[in-house]
Amino acid sequence: MADINSLVLSGRLTRDSELSYTESGMAVLRFSIANNRRMKKNDEWIDYPQYFDCVIFSKRAESLNDYLKKGKQVVVSGSLKYESWQDRNTGDKRSKVNIFVDNLQMFSSGSNTIQMQDSDVNSLTNHKKEDVVKDIDIVDDKFSEDIPF
């Protein structure tokens, strides 16, 4: 039986996304998210930032690159992928965990959101990016204030 490897995470991009291609031509989009873990200490709420590296592949990577900019608020869902390697310069063993993104939701600067999921990938292959953005549902953000728990 396979174990469960699934997560949902929200945060803001720490830098613009970076699009690259593998030797076989597959698009790879990389970006990082800052996520604040909020804890109460001495009757005061304190944010503890955490940083996560994310990866998106294929057509979705190409279509999202222009939209994922520093400061953009997103919610991602996907799975964790552990990677390890040996540093070429020092010989030290290195490792990190990436989030392989299956679904992504972008929050616009207003109170609307744009959602893109696996089902959207097929429509992206036959349309210009401008046409696809027009067809995406806009959803009101009813939770613009902090949740008190």
UniProtKB/Swiss-Prot annotation:
GO cellular component: nucleoid
GO molecular function: single-stranded DNA binding
Keywords: DNA-binding
Entry's transmembrane regions: none
Every SSB domain range: 4-108
GO BP term, example: DNA replication
Source species, domain of life: Bacteria
PANTHER family: SINGLE-STRANDED DNA-BINDING PROTEIN (PTHR10302), SINGLE-STRANDED DNA-BINDING PROTEIN, MITOCHONDRIAL (PTHR10302:SF0)
Quaternary structure (record): Homotetramer.
Protein name: Single-stranded DNA-binding protein
Organism this protein belongs to: Borreliella burgdorferi (strain ATCC 35210 / DSM 4680 / CIP 102532 / B31)
Gene that encodes it: ssb
